[in-house]
Regions:
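Acidic/histidine-rich catalytic cores of soluble enzymes
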Residues: 1-80
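Alpha-helix N-cap/loop-to-helix initiation residues
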Residues: 2, 115-116
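Active-site catalytic pocket residues across diverse enzymes, especially alpha/beta-hydrolases
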Residues: 20, 100, 127
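A short, acidic, amphipathic alpha-helical segment used as a generic capping/interface helix at domain edges
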Residues: 47-55, 84-101
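Charge-rich, low-complexity N-terminal segments
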Residues: 85, 108-112
Length: 128
């Protein structure tokens, strides 16, 4: 999500993984805000999941850092927001948490601690 860096999109990360000795043992942590800032349109969930699957494979996602985005889509800026209070929005997070539950992928919140409890409750509500 920071722009001109290696691994800014998942196809670059897939290329790195495929060059290690045991690529089957390597997975990724997918950050919702970083990916949104890098051009992954979480508000268009189905197409984004298809894009991720085509670039790296959904099975490579081992963990999700759940953060909304203070910045616009494809901004190339790393600015986290609390769930539902940013540009990704609650509808997209409803799809993301349901996907994580279906695939048994853990999620970690990285926003300030004062509101983490509220974020957790919102994610549980969106999931169910």
């Amino acid at each position: 999500g920071a722009g001109k860096i290696i691994g800014d999109d998942l196809s670059e990360i897939a290329e790195i993984i495929n060059k290690v000795n045991h690529p089957a043992l390597v997975g990724i942590c997918l950050d919702t805000q970083h990916s949104f800032a890098s051009g992954y349109a979480w508000r268009d969930f189905e197409n984004t999941i298809k894009k991720i699957d085509a670039e790296i494979g959904l099975e490579k996602i081992k963990l999700i850092h759940a953060n909304d985005s203070l910045t616009e889509f494809n901004s190339k800026k790393d600015r986290h927001a609390h769930i539902g209070q940013g540009q990704i929005g609650p509808e997209a997070f409803q799809n993301i948490v349901k996907f994580a539950k279906e695939k048994n992928i853990d999620m970690i919140l990285e926003t300030e601690h004062e509101k983490v409890k509220e974020d957790i409750e919102l994610l549980k509500k969106l999931r169910d």
